[in-house]
Structures are given as structure tokens and as C-alpha cells.
Amino acid sequence: MRYFIILLALVALGVCAPNVKQRAADQDLLNKQQDVIQLLQKISQPIPNQELQNLGASYDIESNSHQYKNPIIVMYYAGAVKAGLVQPQGTTFSNSISQLRKEVSLLYRILLGAKDYQTFLKTAAWARVHVNEGQFLKAFVAAVLTRQDTQSVIFPPVYEILPQHHLDSRVIQEAQNIAIQNTQGKNNQQNILIPVNYSALLSHDEQQLSYFTQDIGLAAYYAQVNLAGYIQEQNQQQQQQPLTQQQYQQQIVGKYLQQQAGQQDQQANIGRGAQYLYLHQQLLARYELNRLSNGLGPIKDIDYENVQSLYQPHLRGLNGLEFAGRPQNLQLQSQRNQLIQYVATLEKRLRDAIDSGNVITPQGVFLSLYQPQGMNILGDLIEGTGRSVNPRYYGSLQAAARKLLGNAPEVENIWDYTPSSLELGEVAVHDPVFYQLYKKVMNLYQQYQQSLPVYQYNDLILPGVTIQNVDVSQLVTLFTDFYVDLDAVTGHQSQQQQEEQTQSRVRAHLKRLDHQPYQYKIAVHSEQNVPGAVVRVFLGPKHDHQGRPISISKNQHLFVELDQFIQNLHAGENTIIRNSQQAPGQSPDWPSTSQIQRGVNAAIRSQEPFYITEPHQIFSFPARLSLPKGQPQGFPLQFLVVISSSNPLNVPYGPVIPEQSLTYQDQQYQVVSVEQYQQLKEQGQISQVGGGIQQNVEVLPENLVNAQQQVQAVRNYYANLYTKYHGQYPNTQIQNPVGQGQDMTYSVQGVGVVNAGGWLGQQGNSWSQQQVQQAQQVQQQMQAAMAAVQQSQQRHQHAAQMIYGHQQSHHGLHINSSPSSVQSGQQQQSVLQGLGVQGVQQGVQGVQTAQGVQGVQGVQGVQGVQGVQGVQGVPGLLQGVQQVFGQGVQGMNVPYGMQRGQSGGQTWSNSQVQGVAVPGSGIVASGQQHAGGWQSIYAQPQTVQDQIVSEYYQNKPISEVIGGAISLDGKPLGFPLDRPLSLGALSVPNIFVKDVLVFHQGQPTNDITQ
């Protein structure tokens, strides 16, 4: 309720005027930013700044122990460092070794306990000189993130601090060789680029996904997510006395007991445990979508005894030893029996807790999982990084499994230790087994969700609000160039050399997945004013890897959240236009060390301001990777739009009998009306089956019968169960809708000319089977015509601007030459009306009365197509039919940069979508220009996020900011896909499902060729 009141207050202040004013750093913050940069430069060498190096070497931490909140820990740790009884420098740090975890935790607590900034700086310099590099990096970063006097300081990207952990060891070796040649005067080049192709040894399937799994931006993101699990609020770190049993129970367990007693704060239900599960579900869903885009099936189940996943990372630690890898067939039974049994035991205990509904605390208290805090409890148990209610019994499943599956060799001496990538938070996402492991973790999460009551019609309905249509501009992915500074591995560079830039600069050149910025438009009718409505947008698969339609309710774990925002709805018609770059929970590219340094230096010299970057603007998921890689002919997905009230959610928590165990007898299952269900909720409980189990209830709304016949998302609730003919993949034939064989029609989104067969999407008007057959015949004729045209075509550049017609569903057949199309907004009179043809010149004859495009000019003399007419006033249409991949694209899309066209239609201004031009391509990428982009250095004007997003994160601990999880109204993360959805829930008018295609433009892989 407290959060609801705050939300209403923000709405009253005008959430529709969302821009956040940038704040410039003062001199104090600039100095601190300078200190952090210098302490993290060339971390395996002495500090380049001689003043800091001398400070660290001369500081006597023991004699200054009174300057810390816990002097006993200072004396204990400093004595161990002086005696050489801590991890030495030059060896690789990993959380898998208990002693190393202890040392880094003590250092973190010391840094956090420094009473003032100067003491903190001296301690950091001392640790930088005397402590292991990996331990220092983790403790120092965590302390800067947590301390109040270092807020708004940002770090260099982890792949520039430790490039050895992210780039192939051969690239690192080449950079070091270049540095040696420079010192010998054999190389006078000032700027040297080393092309990087991801060369980890992977299976064939995983190699296709290397653009995602080996992405260094993804690794940097997950490094922070992993670190956040070990960061606790500052007041919890300063315990000077051991906790009594009563204090322990109150601090760790008490908040959950209060929830059971009815003291509920909806926003407080979203803690680290819930975020841990949600962020990993989202990461896994993105990986699954990219698998699907590449024609691969679901993630394979992991076997703790026999691991089938080839991986040789070709990465190395500071000691020069390469990280451990795995052969294709790894037998662990003979060498890791004890660890295998331990991991299996932890998993069984978690499954038992989910099935029984209760977690046992060290005091013998049974704590229910089926309560508002249940998600937090379960997530904390699985992660096991200090928040678990019973760490002795439940351990840390994810940490133990990483150690097992990583296959690092057992050693007795730290100098010989080489951890696996899986054990290092900053590179774990590079290992394919990471995703197999987290599929098992997500299976636990889904097992828990299946025992929660499903969302019903009453739970999701927003009375009087109807989403009439959703238009999405073109979704196009591409590979863009990126450069990584390798200064950390290219020898010592003095501060004077840094300032004068006298040494040559060695950088790695990579290609990374990105996408063009896009917009979407939501047409909403509301019968009354609805202040502070929350709009959530998800993206998920339309078909499985075999081409069969999926059920959203049964596959909600495969959907990713693209956007969330507050919208005031007024009575009548509402048109919402949203820019992809405004989305919260996503971050632009991380600024490089040199960019940060230049910004600080310029601000110190008063040349230009150094703007403060908020944590949520830099620690969220990479915006570049928010869309899965598209396909030349279009990758079919679903856009799911949900509008909900900002009122608190009132739903039961069960547990209910899972579907696989339900007999549907009357004592277990009942169908009730909307009114009956509302009465049951108002009474505070659903009927009990017995033993604390709630009865399974399904609501029958009045519109369900029609929805089962007309709404494809509702029809697909049963997925492929009632489909007579199975579809094929990838996208070469239309999937027969659920219920095929009845006297029915279905919608067709577009007919595209495809190199290997035609593809029919679904959207727009209802077409009969006969019409579809006619369309397919036309498609074959057009393919023959296009083949002749292609013989004389030449390559051209694309620019972009979207031209939209009426608000009703778009209609028409599409024949495209690239991820762009012209589409008629007129009502179809026949199969061929609205045919979109791009780049075909006059003289093409054969197909008649295809109204939709006029004045399109290109290659002459092709016989077979005639009378293509329609869109007028579009100067500058690209000449010639090019790259005829045959994508059918919904929306009236015209390539970026074209002039305004069809009179009477609605045009989306090109200025609403900002981006960065990719050199030599004429295309625009969005990763660098996402809202909150650092310093506005990439383009002007800078897109900014809504004010309410900053308000949301303002008072949260940093561990709950990192990762980008957000719920503006306090509902569960991922709502309403945090639970299964009933048929009635899918039929509410404030939920809309839109079919979309994601295209890929440019080179098909991220390889760099010379």
C-alpha cells in the first residue's frame, strides 16, 4: 500500500512528462572518479599513478585500525597479509575455494568500514599494492558500489580491466608481442587493430550461437549480476559482535514470518531472491530465442555424471595458465563421486521443499513457500550467497554445480590452480554448460510456479480498457564494429605517457550483435480515465523448433520483457507511441576507460560537464542484445502487450495440485463465474481440498466462447494437442492453426518470396483456404519474375523511415528485396490487392489489378507482372529489385530515410528514433544510443528514460538495482508471466498478441575477414 500511494503521487506529478534532467559531477566526484580509474589501470602491474603507488606502499593499516568501524577485522586481515598467509598476487581468484572467499569477504568489509573517504582511498591503494589482483578487484568494486561517499562513480568495463578473461589468449599474446616491439623501436605505428573472431572450441550448434554466448558485453553484465549476490546492505556488514540465535532468526527469517502474519508490502516482496530467479529466467529465454532463430531445439538436459558439451575457452588467467575446458564426452562419475552426490542432494532438498510447500530453518521453524515472499525465499536458497534462511542445510546449488561441471583440476597449491570459466562470474556465460545448468535451476522455478494458482480473468482484467491494435515498425538485427582497448596487457605506461598518448594504442576489433531502433504504436480504447496504467511489453516465440504453435501459458518462461512504462489513459481513443530506446531494464554500451578519462579531464579543465550516470543506466541488460538475431526471410515471434492497473494485486498463493497430478474431480477442480470468483477472493481464501492445498478453480468469462474461436492466443492454449497436420521449420510452410479440419478461416500477415519456398504469416484479414492457395500460386509466379529481375540488379544502401496507414490491421501481400517493405493500408478487394513490390521497374507484366504500389521503377523488360499501382508520392524509392529474400513484413514500412508518402496516412517521424550510423553501411544501430547512454557522446539528442524509472531505483540497495529488474507497480517481476495463465486470462481485452518478424541485415555472422 505504501508503494501504491507513492506511485499515485508520481502519476499526479505528471509521469507523462518523463524526461530526467542530467546532473553534472562536482569537483569532489571528479576526483573520486579519477582515483577509481587509476586504481584499476593495468591491474597486474604497479599503479601507473606514482602518487597512489607510493601511498599504497607506505600506508600502515594496522596503526590506523581505529579509522575503521571494526578494527579487530583490520588487525586480523593485515596480520595475515604481512605474514604472507593470503592468496599471492599473480594467481587466479575463484569463489569456489572457501579460503579465498573468506579473504575477499574480509577485505570487502574493511573497505566498507573505512570511516571516511580518505581512509578508504588509502586502504584501496594499500590493497592494490599488497593483495591478489582478483580479490582486490571484487572487493574494491563491491565497496565502491555500496559506500555512500562513492555513489555515482562508474568503473571501466571488466573486459578492459582483465582482457585475459574475455579475449582469446592468442589475441592477448599478439598484443603483448606488439608492445615488446614498440619498446625495442621496431614498430612505429600509433594505432594498431587486432581482428578478433571468437575462437573458443565449441560444438557445431554452439558455434552458431557464439555471437551471443561469447559476447563480452553480456559477460560484463553478468559479472555485475553475479557480484550483486554477494553484496549486502551496508548496515548488515558492520556487525561487531556475533549474532545471538534470536538476532539471527529476526534478521534472516523474521521478515518472512512477518509476511505470513499478514504484514504485507507489495514492493517489499521483490527482493534479491525473486530478482535472481527472474534475471536468470530472462537470460535463459534470450538464449533460447537465439537457439530458435538458428533452427536449434531446446537446451539439452544436464547429466551430473556424463557431461555432453564440448568447450575449450582459450582464455587464461594472470598466471598465464589457460582456464579448464571439457571434452565432448566428460565422464565425472569416477573422479567426482562425492561432489556429484552433494549436488544431487541439494537439488533433492529444494524439490522436496517445493513439493511439501515448506522450508525448514535452523531453529526448526517451517516457513511456507506459498506466500508473497515465497519467490524470495526460493531464490535465496538456490543462490546461496548469504541470504538463505538455512545455508547449512540447503547450501548453494548453483555454486556447487558450477564447481562440478566446470571440470577444473584438483590441485593442492594455489600456484597451479586454474579455475574453469563456469566458476568465474565474469566469464561464466561463455560456457554452454552454464545454460544447461540454469535450465535445471529454472525447472525448479517452474515446478514452484506450477503449484501457484493460475491467473484468472478477474486477476488480469482492467475494466473498460481494450487494446484495439498494435503496430510494430521493422525489427532488424545486424553486426556492428566494436573496439576494446588492450592497454592492460601491453606493458607499463607512465601517467605522463597516458596524458601525452605517446605510446601506440593497441585495440581489439570485434563484431557484435545489435539492432536498429524501432517503435511500436498501441491503439487503446478506454471507457473512463485510468491514471497510472502500467504497460508491459514482452517478446516470445510463435512456434517451437518443429514449427508447431506454442501455448503462451505453458511457455511463459520463453518470453523476454522488452519494455514497461506508466501511461495515463483518458476516456475514448488513446494512441501510445513508444521508442525502443526508452525501455528500462536495458543499458547502452559501457564506456571505455579512455572515454571516461577524457570526460573527467575535460570536466576538470572546465571544458564540458561530466554528467552523472545512474547505476540502473549502466548495470542493466545490454540493449544491443534485446532482440534475438533475425533471419533474412524474417524470424517469426510474438509481441505480447499487457495493460494493467497500478492497484495492488490480490491473488491467492496456493499451493494447488499441479496439472500433472490433477484428477479434475469436483473436490479438486471447479469452474466458476466471474462473480463467484470475486466473492471467493473477497472472502480471503479459495476452498480448501485439505492439508493446506487450495482447490483448483477456473473462471468462465462471458467472452471466452468467442475468444476460443477468434483469438489465436487462446486457441493456441492447447498448443499442438488438437492440430491435425504438423508444421515444418524453418518458416517454409504455414503452420496449420489449432483446430484445423473444422470449417474455419484464419489470418494471413504476408506472402514473401523466399529462396527455398514460401512463408505465410498470420495477421490482418481473414482468408479462406482457397484464397491462401491462390496466394501461393501468385507467390510462385512472382518468384519466377523476381529471378529474372535479380540477374540485372545491383547492390544499394538502405535508409529508414516508417510510413503507416490507418489504425486498422494492415493488409496485403509483400514481396521485399530486403528487411524493408511498402505495404498498402487499403481494404483488400481480392487476394492480390495491396501487393507490395519494392524496386520493380515498368514493363513487368502478368499479374493484374494489384493495387497498392504506384510509380515504382527499376529493371525494365521483365515480362509477367502488370499493373502494380497504389502508393503515391514516395520519392527516392530504391531502384532495382535487390536481395530478394521475400520477407513479409507487417506495418507500412519504408526503408529508413525515404520521404513522406501516402497522403492521409500517419507518418512516424524519423527524429523519434535516434541511433548511431554504422560506418559504410548507411544503417543505424541502437546499442550505443539507448536511454541513459553515457555522456551523450554518441549522438544528439540523447534519448532519456522516464522520471519514474529513476524514482523506482532511487532508494533501492545496489544489489537490487544491478540487473535491471523492474516492477513499477510492485507486482511480481515478469507479471503476468510469473504464473501460468488460464484460458480466461488470455481472453481479457487489455492483453493483445501481435505477430512480428525479426530480420537480419548485412553479413550473416560476426566473423572478421581480412
UniProtKB/Swiss-Prot annotation:
Record key words, sorted: Cytoplasm, Glycoprotein, Nucleus, Secreted, Signal, Storage protein
Reported modifications of this chain: May undergo further proteolytic processing.
Induction: In 5th instar larvae induced by juvenile hormone. Post-transcriptionally repressed by miRNA-34 and miRNA-210 but not miRNA-317. Induced by a protein rich diet or repressed by a diet lacking protein.
TM segment ranges: none
Signal peptide extent: 1-16
Tissues expressed in: Expressed in the fat body and secreted into the hemolymph (at protein level). Present in trophocytes and oenocytes of the fat body (at protein level). Present in the ovaries of workers and queens in oocytes, nurse cells, follicle cells and their precursors during oogenesis (at protein level). Not expressed in ovary or testis. Expression levels in the fat body are higher in queenless workers with active ovaries compared to queenright workers with inactive ovaries; this does not translate to higher protein levels in the hemolymph.
Chief place where the protein resides: secreted
Family annotation (Gene3D superfamilies): Di-copper center containing domain from catechol oxidase, Hemocyanin, C-terminal domain, Hemocyanin, N-terminal domain
GO molecular function, one term: nutrient reservoir activity
Localization: Secreted; Nucleus; Nucleus, Nucleolus; Cytoplasm
Every Hemocyanin middle domain range: 157-445
Domain Hemocyanin N-terminal: 30-151
CC terms in the record's Gene Ontology section: endocytic vesicle; extracellular space; nucleolus; nucleus
Pfam families: Hemocyanin_C (PF03723), Hemocyanin_M (PF00372), Hemocyanin_N (PF03722)
Glycan-linked positions: N197
Family named by the database record: Belongs to the hemocyanin/hexamerin family.
Complex formation: Probable homohexamer.
Function noted in UniProt: Storage protein that may function as a nutrient supply to compensate for lack of dietary proteins during metamorphosis and egg production. Has a secondary role as a nucleolar protein that may be involved in oogenesis.
Protein name: Hexamerin 110
Gene from which this protein is expressed: Hex110
